[in-house]
């Protein structure tokens, strides 16, 4: 969606998020299920997703997709955080200790960013909050300059 590669299977126009996560997810899955494994886009998406998950496992603390909580409390995985931070990881190209430190610092920045945290906890599925979340993520991607 952020890269403008998904196509709405009903309208054949670029898919846009309109505050209805069920509809958006359904259309995205229909689009993805139409791709053949030999398709270049399929291969690229598979590669990006795999790398993002490998980076998450390697660099994030245990429970890394959970929002901060009080000691002794364990919050569930936050899906909006999972999707947006995974998107950030999927866009980065880099290796080595310095790159890993940059990713970990970015993670910590986000955990202290009130606007980002608000977008993960209030009206999470609204278009306004979704766009705000990805605006913050895209700005960080640009600042990291590792694409």
What does each of the following model-derived ranges do?
Residues 1-147:
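Flexible coil/loop and intrinsically disordered segments
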């Amino acid at each position: 969606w952020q890269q403008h590669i998904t196509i709405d299977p009903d309208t054949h126009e670029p898919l846009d998020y309109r505050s209805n996560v069920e509809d958006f997810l359904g259309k995205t899955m229909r689009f993805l299920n139409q791709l053949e494994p030999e398709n270049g886009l399929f291969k690229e998406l598979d590669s990006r997703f795999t790398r993002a998950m490998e980076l998450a496992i390697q660099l994030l603390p245990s429970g890394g997709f959970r929002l901060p909580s009080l000691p002794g409390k364990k919050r569930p995985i936050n899906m909006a955080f999972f999707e947006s931070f995974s998107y950030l990881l999927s866009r980065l190209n880099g290796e080595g200790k310095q790159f890993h430190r940059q990713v970990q610092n970015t993670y910590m920045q986000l955990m202290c960013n009130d606007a980002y945290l608000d977008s993960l906890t209030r009206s999470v599925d609204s278009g306004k909050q979704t766009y705000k979340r990805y605006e913050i993520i895209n700005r960080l991607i640009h600042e990291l300059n590792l694409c």
